[in-house]
Amino acid sequence: MGKDTTLQIKGILILMMLWLHLYSNEDLFDGTCYEFLYWFNGKPFSYHFAKKFCSMCVPAYIFLSGYGLGKVYCKKALSGQSMGNGKRCFNLYVRLWVIIAIFVPIGCYFNPEHYPYSMLELVENMTGISTYYNGAWWFLLPYIILAMSSRYFIRYIMQFGKKGDIVNTLMLLAISVFGYVAIAKVNDSTDILMRLLTGLMAMLYLSFMFFVGIMFVKHNVIEKAINRMATFSNATRYSLAAVVVLIIGRLCMGNSALIHIPFTPLIILSLAILLNGKSNKFLQLFGHHSTNMWLVHFFFITYIFDGQIYILRYPIVIFVALVAISLATSKIIDRILMYVQPLLNKRL
C-alpha cells in the first residue's frame, strides 16, 4: 500500500472522526440541537453511524501507524538506520504545543471555567498525560508509547514463524481485551498516577490493532490482495461492494468497541484495494491535514464554543461547517509550523 493510498484512507478516517464527535452524544436526542431521522430504538441514524461505524477511526489510525512503522522498520532498521521515531514524536508534540498556545488562551476567554491557570495541568496536557483541555487527544500518549517502542516491538514480531504468529495474535488479543475492560475500572482523572494508568490501559487496548498493522506488512497481506484482485475485471466493484457490506454489517451490531477488532483490518484492506492506483485529491487533502484536524476539531464542537455549531440544525450542514473550519485552522497551523519546527529541530 503506497503513501497516496494511505493518505486517502487517513482522509476518510478524519472525516469519520469529525462525524463521531458531532453525533455520538445521546444528550442531543431531544431534538433541540439538530434535526435528525430516526433509525431504530428511538435513536437517530446519525448516532448509529457515529457510534457503530465512525468510532472505528482510532483503531484504524493505529492500524495504519503499525503498518507504516512496519514498512519503515523493513526499509531502515534492518539496514541499521534509525527509524526516526524520536523526531516523529517530537514533531507531533510541537504540533500539539502550537495548538495549545493558540486555543488555550482563547478558551480562557470564552470558557474560563474549563481552562484554569494551573501550570501542572498545562504540563500534563502538553505531554498527553491529561486530556482535560481536549478529550479527543485521549490516544496521543498511547500512540507515543507505541511509536517509541515500535523498533523493539516489531523486531520481536518479525522473528517468529506461523506458530509464533498465532501465539502472539492470541496473546495480544487477550491483552487488548484486558486493556479495554480495565480502562473503565481505572478511568479516574483526579490523580496523575491514575491518568498515567488510564493511558497505559488505552495503549494495551490499541496494541492489537498496532500489531495487526505490522502483521499485514510481515505477510504482505495488502500487496497480495491487490495482485490477486488485479486478475478480476471488476476489482473496483468488488472492493466497493465489500466496503458497503462491512459498513452495513457493522451498523447491525452493538456499540462495543471490541467489535471493531475484526472489522477494522477488513475495512482497511477493502479501501486499499478500492483506492489502489487512484489519486483522489479531495481525500489526500484531508489526509494531509488529518493530524491537525484531529487535534483542533473538538474545540469547535464543545470546549470553546459550547455547542454553538448545532445552531446550523441539519447534520450534513453542521458536518460540512466543522470540516471547513477545522481544515482552515489546520492550514493556519501548518503555516506557523513552517517557521517553528525548523527552529526547534536546529536546537536539538
Language-model-detected regions and their locations in the chain:
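Interfacial loop-to-helix transition and helix-capping segments at the boundaries
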Residues: F45-V58, I129-P142, A182-F211, V245-I268, ...
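Aromatic-anchored segments of alpha-helical transmembrane domains
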Residues: L15-Y23, P105, M126-I129, L170-V186, ...
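Alpha-helical transmembrane segments of multi-pass integral membrane proteins
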Residues: F210, R237-N345
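Alpha-helical transmembrane segments in multipass membrane proteins, preferentially the mid-helix core
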Residues: L146-R155, F211-A225, I267-N280
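Short juxtamembrane and helix-loop transition motifs at transmembrane-helix boundaries
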Residues: Q81-S82, V98-G107, E124-Y132, D188-R195, ...
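Hydrophobic alpha-helical segments of polytopic membrane proteins
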Residues: Y156-M171, V221-V243
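Membrane-cytosol interface segments of multi-pass membrane proteins
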Residues: M1-V177, H289, Y310-L348
